[in-house]
């Protein structure tokens, strides 16, 4: 009977028909668009450029505060202090490696990890996490504001005791009686002033700074304060703040004077603990210090033995591919290379690095074309290889003659830095396979003196073996006087 009563309502509800969907939902509208999902080809000059100059703001992590705690027991009614010291803040470290080649992966603001606070049972706070930034080999550090970076020694900073604050627990109490009494009788206002001064000295921080990446020179920059030229080399650019003292260490410090001993006889530790808790925020002993701050300008100067310098579309990238296993981007238009490319040329008992520098034009020192900022990458090179286009200006075509190209290249190097062209040099006469290039080569040898000229065809790899031997002789040196291309040795008229 009860089963029939349960089935009847279910049948009654099932008699209702489900609402049908409206026609516009049964037949959805299909939208069409003329927009193609296929992405268009990116223009050549829209390629991401190399970021070889970067402004970095670094700040060390904050130190942890000391703990104010009391351990009580049946035998000790008032208890004993057992608060631990705060941990030391994390550092900001720069490490050079072959894994990166520019500063595109860096963030403009970086801060070390915050340290942990001390806890009861005399436990020390955790040390802040170090922030390690990877930079390419050849990074030069310019200091705008802050402390000078220091090189990391073999001993890691993590091995140091975080409670090892300079001049706190290692002093002889007997030799500092007068100073201890003076510290105990200081007023609260004097303590606040001392705390503020100590924090200011510890920070060494700028008040206001513009952290955008400009090309403008700043007046108060300390140039070349540090360089990273070896794999795995590390430099600390911002140190973490020291941790504050817990009431265990603070009590030991107070007990070091005779005045404090007489005071302790009259007052118990509980009253001292209450006073310490009330002045916790104002106490410079128990509060952790802030980390140091610095504003740095990072600049990349690639380390290469040979620098390929030439006008746009002279065939430098193709030549680099013929000399080494590098695969730079090659195109039939000017300014194909937007970033320096590096390649290794290996011999049986010798190896050297060749850098392909983006093309230079006349007036590059006035920021024409790609400018001359990339020339900093050849400041460390031993040899300059001037790559000229023999086919330029032939048969009424537009372009400069090879000797005019050499004159403009030497002038742009000197405009960038005086004496930059005064190093071992040779000339690479590229595109020797073009019609009329042989006569142009003879004219080039007549107009340019004092430097060896190597005719090559980078596409067909003709003359590349002789060029490798010439580069090896200049890089290796062997005590022989090197040849230098000078402006007075180029006859243009």
From Swiss-Prot:
* Location in or out of the cell: Mitochondrion
- Acidic residues compositional bias, start-end: 187-196
SUPFAM superfamilies associated with the record: Obg GTP-binding protein N-terminal domain, P-loop containing nucleoside triphosphate hydrolases
The residue ranges of the Obg domain are 48-303
The molecular function GO annotations come to:
GTP binding; GTPase activity; magnesium ion binding
Q: Which organism is it from?
A: Arabidopsis thaliana (Mouse-ear cress)
Locate the region Disordered: 65-89, 146-215
Q: Which GO terms describe its cellular component?
A: mitochondrion
Define the transit peptide region by residue numbers: 1-28
Q: Which cysteines form disulfides?
A: none
Protein name, please?
Answer: Probable GTP-binding protein OBGM, mitochondrial
PROSITE patterns recorded = G_OBG, OBG
Residue stretches making up the OBG-type G domain: 304-476
For this chain, the family text in UniProt reads: Belongs to the TRAFAC class OBG-HflX-like GTPase superfamily. OBG GTPase family.
Q: Which residues bind GTP?
A: 310-317, 356-360
The UniProt keyword set, sorted, is: GTP-binding, Mitochondrion, Nucleotide-binding, Transit peptide
Q: What does this protein do?
A: May bind GTP and have GTPase activity.
InterPro entries per UniProt: G_OBG, GTP-bd, GTP-bd_Obg/CgtA, GTP1_OBG_dom, GTP1_OBG_dom_sf, OBG_GTPase, P-loop_NTPase
């Amino acid at each position: 009977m009860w089963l029939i009563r349960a089935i009847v309502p279910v049948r009654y509800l099932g008699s209702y028909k489900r609402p049908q969907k409206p026609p516009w939902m049964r037949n959805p509208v299909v939208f069409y668009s003329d927009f193609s999902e296929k992405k268009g080809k990116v223009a050549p000059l829209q390629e991401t450029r190399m970021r070889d100059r970067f402004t970095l703001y670094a700040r060390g992590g904050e130190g942890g505060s000391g703990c104010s705690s009391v351990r009580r027991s049946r035998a000790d009614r008032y208890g004993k202090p057992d608060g631990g010291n705060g941990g030391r803040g994390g550092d900001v470290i720069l490490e050079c490696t072959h894994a990166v080649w520019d500063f595109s992966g860096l963030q403009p603001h970086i801060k070390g990890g915050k340290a942990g606070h001390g806890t009861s049972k005399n436990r020390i706070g955790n040390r802040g996490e170090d922030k390690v930034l990877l930079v390419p080999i050849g990074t030069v550090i310019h200091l705008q504001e802050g402390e000078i970076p220091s090189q990391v020694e073999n001993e890691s900073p993590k091995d140091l005791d975080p409670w090892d604050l300079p001049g706190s627990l290692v002093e002889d109490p007997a030799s500092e009686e007068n100073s201890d009494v003076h510290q105990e009788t200081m007023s609260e206002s004097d303590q606040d002033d001392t705390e503020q001064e100590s924090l200011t000295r510890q920070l060494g921080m700028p008040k206001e700074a513009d952290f955008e990446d400009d090309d403008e020179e700043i007046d108060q920059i300390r140039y070349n304060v540090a360089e990273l030229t070896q794999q795995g080399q590390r430099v600390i650019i911002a140190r973490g703040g020291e941790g504050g003292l817990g009431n265990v260490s603070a009590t030991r410090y107070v007990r070091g004077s005779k005045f404090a001993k007489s005071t302790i006889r009259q007052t118990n530790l509980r009253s001292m603990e209450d006073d310490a808790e009330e002045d916790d925020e104002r106490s410079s002993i128990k509060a952790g210090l802030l980390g140091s701050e610095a504003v740095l300008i990072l600049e990349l100067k690639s380390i290469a033995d040979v620098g390929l310098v030439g006008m746009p579309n002279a065939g430098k990238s193709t030549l680099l591919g013929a000399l080494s296993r590098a695969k730079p981007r090659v195109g039939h238009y000017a300014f194909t290379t937007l970033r320096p490319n590096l390649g290794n040329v290996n011999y049986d008992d010798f190896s050297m690095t060749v850098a392909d520098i983006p093309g230079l034009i006349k007036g590059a020192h006035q920021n024409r074309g790609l400018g001359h900022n990339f020339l900093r990458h050849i400041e460390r090179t031993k040899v300059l290889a001037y790559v000229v286009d023999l086919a330029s200006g032939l048969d009424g075509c537009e372009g400069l003659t090879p000797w005019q190209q050499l004159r403009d290249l030497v002038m742009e190097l000197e405009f960038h830095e005086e004496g930059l062209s005064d190093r071992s040099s040779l000339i690479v006469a590229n595109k020797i396979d073009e019609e009329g290039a042989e006569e142009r080569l003879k004219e080039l040898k007549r107009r340019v003196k004092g430097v060896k000229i190597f005719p090559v065809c980078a596409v067909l790899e003709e003359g590349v073996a002789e060029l490798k031997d010439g580069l090896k002789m200049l890089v290796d040196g062997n005590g022989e006087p090197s040849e230098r291309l000078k402006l007075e040795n180029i006859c243009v008229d």
